[in-house]
Amino acid sequence: MSNQLNTMDIKEILKYLPHRYPFLLIDRVLDFTRGESLHAIKNVTINEPFFQGHFPVQPVMPGVLILEAMAQATGLLAFKTMSEEPSPNVLYYFAGIDKARFKRVVGPGDQIHFHVKMIKERRGIGVFIGEAYVDGELACSAEIMCARREISK
């Protein structure tokens, strides 16, 4: 667990998100406020497996993976908002996306800052606004929905 109550290191993130290499796309949570917002980062390196084919001459992080990372950040905020302990029986699924826009290319050496804000939650479905920044410049924005689901064994 992180030293501060409103941060999360990778060990804590792994307790909440089911994703693993190569699909775990959040490295650290720098700050969160339950029911309001979360700020997370992803360090993008040339060693990312997607750069082998997207694109070898001019490596670009696929936009869908930027959105997936944003969705992972919303899942973390949803768990923290509901004060729910990590459980293999509960997941927050990426349920929908609206108004996705890409403004800047993301490549090796970039650090993406994800800022997600909770707009509303009803019956286990949360609506969030997400933004991804690189060097203070907006790279991507979207409205994301995630749904809480219990997994039966």
Swiss-Prot record:
Residue positions of the active site: H54
GO biological process: fatty acid biosynthetic process; lipid A biosynthetic process
EC assignment: 4.2.1.59
Coiled-coil region list: none
Molecular function terms, GO-annotated: (3R)-hydroxyacyl-[acyl-carrier-protein] dehydratase activity
Catalytic activity: a (3R)-hydroxyacyl-[ACP] = a (2E)-enoyl-[ACP] + H2O
InterPro entries on file: FabA_FabZ, FabZ, HotDog_dom_sf
Subcellular location: Cytoplasm
Top-level lineage group: Bacteria
Disulfide bonds: none
SUPFAM superfamilies assigned to the protein according to its UniProt record, in alphabetical order: Thioesterase/thiol ester dehydrase-isomerase
GO cellular component entries: cytoplasm; membrane
Keywords of this entry: Cytoplasm, Lipid A biosynthesis, Lipid biosynthesis, Lipid metabolism, Lyase
Family: Belongs to the thioester dehydratase family. FabZ subfamily.
Record's function text: Involved in unsaturated fatty acids biosynthesis. Catalyzes the dehydration of short chain beta-hydroxyacyl-ACPs and long chain saturated and unsaturated beta-hydroxyacyl-ACPs.
PANTHER family cross-referenced by the UniProt entry: 3-HYDROXYACYL-[ACYL-CARRIER-PROTEIN] DEHYDRATASE
Protein name (record): 3-hydroxyacyl-[acyl-carrier-protein] dehydratase FabZ
Organism of origin: Shewanella denitrificans (strain OS217 / ATCC BAA-1090 / DSM 15013)
Record gene name: fabZ
